[in-house]
A protein has these predicted regions:
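Transmembrane helices of ABC transporter permease
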Residues: 44, 48-61, 72, 173-227, ...
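Juxtamembrane loop-to-helix connectors within ABC transporter transmembrane domains
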Residues: 34, 42, 121, 141-185, ...
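Transmembrane helix-loop-helix hairpins at lipid-water interfaces of multipass membrane proteins
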Residues: 49-113, 194-198, 309-313
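An intracellular "coupling" helix at the cytosolic face of ABC transporter transmembrane type-1 domains
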Residues: 145-146, 164-171, 175, 183, ...
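Short intracellular "coupling" helices and adjacent cytoplasmic loop segments at the cytosolic face
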Residues: 21-26, 126, 134-158, 162-164, ...
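ABC-type nucleotide-binding domain
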Residues: 362-363, 369-617
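Helix-loop-helix
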Residues: 191-205, 275-348, 353-354
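Alpha-helical segments in transporter systems
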Residues: 17-19, 36-39, 47-72, 103, ...
Length: 617
């Protein structure tokens, strides 16, 4: 059992034998499949995206018409200047002014359409991110416990923060960039052909060279972008873990080990990020070099054609501008491909999470939990976190309504695992657990868990006031009921001594109250919830002896008339239990009340006596 729990712990840290961390060299998943899922996901915004495409195309059309129209003004200015020199005419400034006003109108319309499509696309992107975060949040609440025990918290949080942000930025920039780039490429090509097919052919020669270079860089960088996103999640997990446990790290002088462990992960992230960013940064210089070669060839051929009188000076000016505009969308596409890859890597991780197996929350004909009186039967229960390793081998017990049941045994005996099975955090491999004759699998999970109140060894309080944290047990409770619950848990006295009393704000990890006070607040929360069945997992292990005695009295009053399961290593706290189940290696080896088990002089008696021998020693 101890080995099994160690595996689970390492899985939770994300670096154990079954950790999810992606290793360097692992092949990336299908890029086309990821983009296909993303396109399918944003299908609800199809109308808005079509409008964006129309406005982006319109903006590009107005922008593309400008250079050729402006070239007419250059031609008119050149011809007028030559006529004035020769004495045969003058410069027609009226005609040139009309052309300039027309070009100004084109560019104003282009800017307006570009602004509108940008405004719409930003709204669409944020709605998609909002919807995706909402679905991830809902998904988290439907995930089985085993998922979270095999991953770091930071890795899960990275799906909601880093991955969704990366996806949103990619969508916002890539879609409009691709549309405008393609429209510009097609429009410029048409305008270039209308000026000179020969010069167009010279300019187009650079296109296959550009595409070949882009394909090469994309193929090389795709793997590193996926690694970068993956290990960013691991970094987040380690930072969260170190921050949460910094006192333990300092107490055991493990700063050096922690830093070394972080540096190893950070080195992998650095290598993947460096390579991906280096390769992506190579695209623009390469494309600019190829574009300049094409620009020089076009300028040379245009000069020769102008000498022959085939084209005008204004056409050369317009064509040179089009050559610049022709290479620009290719460069933009090269840049946006980097964003598309990051976006695809992020969407791959998000959809991978959204497609994870969920818990079955409801059943077709659920049993009525409101009729439960507290009878619990464990019938030959067998369970293992892994199918090939059974840790609960043959657990059977009958619990009557209102009984106080203590589950004791050495560390790793399976005590806490039984509680997880009872609340269906996991399902048994074989056998059954029944409440009032109904298998726990016949209840809806949410309703089943409403029947239980829990006080865990690891207390958990939320950021908020003390009043809000206690009221979490029953949200509709009045202030008077909250205070009454605090008094029953013997928490009222210390709460009133705190600055702000019940309105004192707890920070994120509730470090502004002591561990014992945290325990009292969680007990008050359970008292307020007033559940039919109670589970106390090491409930008083973090409280001093004097406080433990007072809490024990309050808990005895609370448990009267309710079925209660108590897990405790300090056997002195459960001597008044109606039934004590003694577990060893996943089996019930003894059961009975305290006096009966001592008379047997068996495993329980050895445990009980050894604790007091340790105290005397």
């Amino acid at each position: 059992m101890s080995n099994e729990r160690e595996k689970v712990r390492m899985q939770h840290r994300g670096r154990g034998p079954m950790g999810r961390g992606m290793q360097p060299g692992e092949k990336p998943k299908d890029l086309k499949s990821s983009l296909g899922k993303l396109l399918s996901y944003i299908g609800n915004f199809k109308a808005a995206i079509i409008v964006v495409m129309i406005f982006a195309a319109a903006s590009t059309v107005f922008n593309v018409i400008g250079p050729k129209t402006l070239g007419k003004a250059t031609t008119a200015l050149s011809e007028g200047l030559m006529a004035k020199i020769q004495g045969t005419g003058s410069i027609d400034f009226t005609y040139i002014g009309q052309i300039l006003l027309f070009v100004l109108g084109l560019y104003v319309c282009s800017a307006a359409f570009n602004f509108i499509q940008g405004w719409i696309m930003t709204g669409v992107t944020q709605k998609i991110c909002y919807r995706m975060r909402k679905e991830i949040s809902r998904k988290i609440n439907r995930m089985p416990m085993k998922y979270f025990e095999s991953r770091t918290y930071g890795e899960v949080l990275s799906r909601i923060t880093n991955d969704v942000d990366t996806l949103g930025q990619g969508l916002n920039q890539s879609i409009t960039t691709i549309i405008t780039s393609v429209a510009t490429l097609v429009g410029v090509l048409i305008m270039m052909l209308s000026i000179s097919p020969l010069m167009t052919l010279i300019a187009i020669v650079i296109l296959p060279i550009s595409m070949a270079l882009i394909s090469f860089v994309v193929k090389k960088s795709q793997k590193y972008f996926k690694d970068q996103q993956e290990y960013l999640g691991h970094i987040n997990g380690q930072v969260e873990e170190v921050y949460g446990g910094h006192l333990v790290i300092k107490a055991f002088n493990r700063e050096k080990d922690t830093i070394e462990e972080f540096n190893r992960t950070n080195e992998i992230l650095y290598q993947s990020a460096w390579k991906s960013q280096f390769l992506s940064g190579m695209m623009q210089p390469i494309m600019m070099f190829v574009g300049n070669l094409g620009y020089a060839a076009v300028a040379l051929s245009g000069g020769l054609l102008a000498i022959r009188g085939t084209i005008t000076i204004g056409d050369i000016q317009a064509f040179i501008q089009y050559v610049k505009n022709f290479t620009q969308p290719i460069q933009q596409i090269a840049q946006v491909i980097n964003q598309v890859q990051s976006m695809a890597a992020a969407s791959e991780r998000v959809f991978e999470f959204l497609n994870e197996e969920e818990e079955d929350q409801t059943v077709e004909h659920p049993a009525d939990v409101s009729a439960v009186t507290g009878t619990v039967d464990f019938d030959h229960v067998q369970f293992g976190y892994n199918p090939d390793q059974t840790i609960i081998k043959d657990f059977s017990a009958h619990v009557k309504p209102g009984q106080k049941i203590a589950i004791v045994g050495p560390t790793g005996a399976g005590k806490t695992t039984m509680v997880k099975l009872l609340m269906r955090f996991y399902d048994v491999n074989s056998g059954s657990i029944k409440l009032d004759g109904h298998d726990v699998r016949d209840f809806n999970r949410r309703e089943l868990r409403d029947a239980f109140g829990m006080v865990l060894q690891d207390t958990w309080l939320f950021k908020g006031t003390i009043m809000e944290n206690i009221r979490y047990g029953r949200l509709e409770a009045t202030d008077e009921e909250v205070i009454a619950a605090a008094k029953a848990a013997h928490a009222d006295h210390f709460i009133k001594t705190l600055p702000g009393g019940y309105q004192m704000e707890l920070n994120e990890d509730a470090s502004n109250v002591s561990q014992g006070q945290k325990q009292l607040l969680t007990i008050a929360r359970v008292i307020l919830a007033d559940n039919k069945i109670l589970i106390l997992d090491e409930a008083t292990s973090s409280v001093d002896t004097r406080t433990e005695v007072t809490i024990q009295k309050a808990m005895d009053n609370l448990m009267r008339g309710r079925t209660s399961f108590v897990i405790a290593h300090r056997l002195s706290t459960i001597r008044n239990a109606d039934l004590i189940l003694v577990m060893k290696d996943g089996d019930i080896v003894e059961q009975g009340n305290h006096e009966e088990l001592l008379e047997k002089n068996g495993f329980y008696a050895n445990l009980y006596n050894s604790q007091f021998e340790d105290v005397v020693a």
